[in-house]
Amino acid sequence: MVENNIPEIMTELRQDIVRVPKVIKKASGIVIFGKKFRSIIFTTDIAIIRNTDADAVIAVYPFTPHPAITKSIIEAADIPVFSGVAGGLTNGKRSAYMGMFAEAQGSLAVVVNGPTPVETIQAVYDVVDIPVIATVTSKYSKIEEKLAAGVAIINISAGKDTVETVKYFRERYPELPIIATGGPDDETIEATIDAGANAITYTPPSNGALFSKKMEKYRKKEYDEDHQ
C-alpha cells in the first residue's frame, strides 16, 4: 500500500460538498473525548452542515439561543455540534437550562459569547459534562476569571486583529486550547495557526452564493449544448 494513502469514499450526489481549506490540516487540533478537531464550520444552515467535510460545526447566531433551533441543528448534523447557550442578552438560569438541553440533545460542547457574565459561565459549568467554550473578541478580554469559572477552550474572533490576539493569549497561556477564525484566505489561516491557534473556524459561502455558482454552471452547459 502507498504510504499516506487515504482512501476517500464519495457518491455522485455528494461531490459538491463544502470543503474547508486544506491548510487547516496544519493546525495541531484539539482532542475532545478522544476525537481530534481541526476544522470547525461556522454556520447554522442545515443544508451546508449536512454537506461539508469540516470536523465539527459551531452553531451560534445573533439571536437568543432557543431549544428548537439547537434541536433542529443537532438532529440534522452528521458531525459534532458546539451549541451557543449564552451571551450578552441570554444568561443566568436560562443559559444553564440551555446548556443542559444542548448536552441532552447531543452537543459535544457549549459556547458562551463574549459578554456572558462569569456567574452564568459558572452556572452552565456546574450542570453540564461537556466543555464550555468562551468566545473572545479582543486581547483586552478578561479571560482569567472565565477560565476559573469553568471555561475549557477559548474561541477567538477578533476580526482583523485575530492573529495578534491569538499570539497575545498563546504567550500568556501556553497550554490553553484555542480556536480562532481563520480569515479570508489560506495566508491568514496559516498566520492564525502559526500564532498559536489549535483549531480554525471557517465561514462558508452562503447558500445563495453556492447556488449562484451552480446556476452559472448550468447556464454554461446549456449555452455549450446550443452552440455545438
Question: How would you name each of these model-derived features?
Answer:
Residues 93-102, 141-150, 184-202:
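Catalytic cores of alpha/beta
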